[in-house]
From Swiss-Prot:
Gene3D superfamilies: Pheromone/general odorant binding protein domain
Protein name: Long form salivary protein D7L2
Tissue: Distal lateral and medial lobes of female mosquito salivary gland (at protein level). Expressed in the head and thorax of the female mosquitoes, where the salivary glands are located. Expressed in salivary gland. Not detected in the female mosquito abdomen. Not detected in the male mosquito tissues.
Signal sequence range: 1-20
Physiological role: Modulates blood feeding of female mosquitoes on vertebrate species by binding and sequestering different mediators involved in the host response, such as biogenic amines and eicosanoids. Binds serotonin, histamine, adrenaline, leukotriene C4, leukotriene D4, leukotriene E4, arachidonic acid and U-46619, a stable analog of thromboxane A2. Does not bind noradrenaline, leukotriene B4, ATP or ADP. Inhibits agonist-induced platelet aggregation and hemostasis.
Domains: entry comment: Lipids and biogenic amines bind independently through different binding pockets, with lipids binding to the N-terminal pocket and biogenic amines to the C-terminal pocket.
GO cellular component, one term: extracellular region
Keywords: Allergen, Disulfide bond, Hemostasis impairing toxin, Platelet aggregation inhibiting toxin, Secreted, Signal, Toxin
Additional notes on this entry: The amount of D7L2 in the salivary glands of 5-day-old Culex quinquefasciatus is approximately 36 ng. During the blood meal, mosquito injects approximately 10 ng of D7L2 into the host.
Subcellular location: Secreted
Organism this protein belongs to: Culex quinquefasciatus (Southern house mosquito)
Length: 313
């Protein structure tokens, strides 16, 4: 249920818009899920996180909640109905099967095993892991093959897919490379002000930051989380107000929300430090797993200067 060699895991960051039919998870999405669940449940305990990286799940509270978090994130467990879901496992496998030697028969057995778990009477972390644990133990290798738990699989994707986000590349620079010419006035203005009319870029960025979820819905909690990380904890209501009063068109959703945040009188002075720190952290999804240092605005600015230079600005 976890992954090996996460530090070398590559990221494919193709984010499509709209409420379309279900789409297989990319390596970027699974990596984000794994690391965010580690961040939330290991809470600075690197030794424990390393156990999860080694696919070791013990029956303790933190490990159980990590496991449940990943299952929910990969849509293998629906918390509201307390039901295990294997509906899309084969579809997930088929999307990337050319990158793995995994046979489909094994995937179907894994799917059947997940489906057979059915509904449980409680979504308690320990109850979820107790139920899923035997399936995890039996199909660990299949899970790693299907949900990008092997470096050799992700390396192949990294080397062959033009949409691959490079190792140690920030989400901001990835989206910028796809939508602007380095050194262009438009890009440099964006990096100085946070404002652009390029909706393709902002859609890529908002999805990459999880400000928009997989279905294209705004996620206020993720924005507030980023404010909290720069020690701004009294603006939650301002975020809600800015988003709730934002006039949004489907075709320009990301641009509209971005404008509403950056131009709000209660938020305009903090959005740049929010974005700067998130850019630094997006360079490695393991940032908070390995880095326990408090927010340091001077260090963040030094890092951002390097990103600006890389952008030709």
């Amino acid at each position: 249920m976890n992954f090996v060699g996460i530090s070398s895991l590559v990221i494919v960051a193709f984010f499509a818009g709209g409420n379309a039919a279900w789409k297989p998870f990319s390596p970027e999405e699974t990596l984000f899920t794994y690391t965010r669940c580690m961040e939330d449940n290991a809470k600075g305990d690197l030794a424990l996180a390393k156990k999860w990286m080694a696919w070791k799940l013990e029956a303790d509270q933190k490990s159980a909640c990590y496991a449940k978090c990943v299952l929910v994130g990969l849509e293998l467990f629906d918390e509201s109905s307390k039901t295990f879901k294997g509906d899309h496992i084969v579809e997930q496998y088929q999307k990337y099967k050319s990158y793995t030697s995994q046979d489909e028969a094994g995937v179907k057995k894994f799917q059947q095993a997940v489906q057979a778990l059915g509904t449980i009477d409680s979504a308690n972390c320990l109850k979820v892991l107790q139920k899923y644990g035997p399936v995890h133990a039996q199909f660990t290798d299949v899970q790693r093959n299907v949900y990008f738990g092997k470096k050799e699989i992700t390396d192949k994707i990294y080397n062959s897919d033009y949409t691959v986000k490079k190792r140690d590349e920030t989400m901001f620079r990835f989206c910028e490379r796809s939508n602007f010419k380095d050194g262009s006035e438009e890009l440099c203005t964006l990096r100085k002000t946070g404002i652009t009319t390029n909706n393709n870029h902002l859609d890529c960025l908002f999805r990459g930051l999880r400000y928009l979820d997989r279905n294209g819905n705004i996620n206020p909690d993720e924005i507030k989380r980023d404010l909290h990380f720069i020690n701004v904890k009294d603006k939650d209501a301002a975020v809600d107000n800015a988003l709730n009063n934002c006039k949004v068109k489907e075709a320009t959703k990301a641009t509209d929300y971005n404008d509403c945040l950056w131009k709000d009188p209660n938020l305009k002075d903090i959005m740049m430090p929010v974005f700067d720190y998130r850019e630094v952290r997006s360079e490695s999804y393991r940032y908070f797993i390995e880095n326990t240092d408090p927010y340091d605005v001077a260090k963040v600015k030094e890092k951002v200067k390097k990103y600006d230079k890389d952008a030709g600005c």
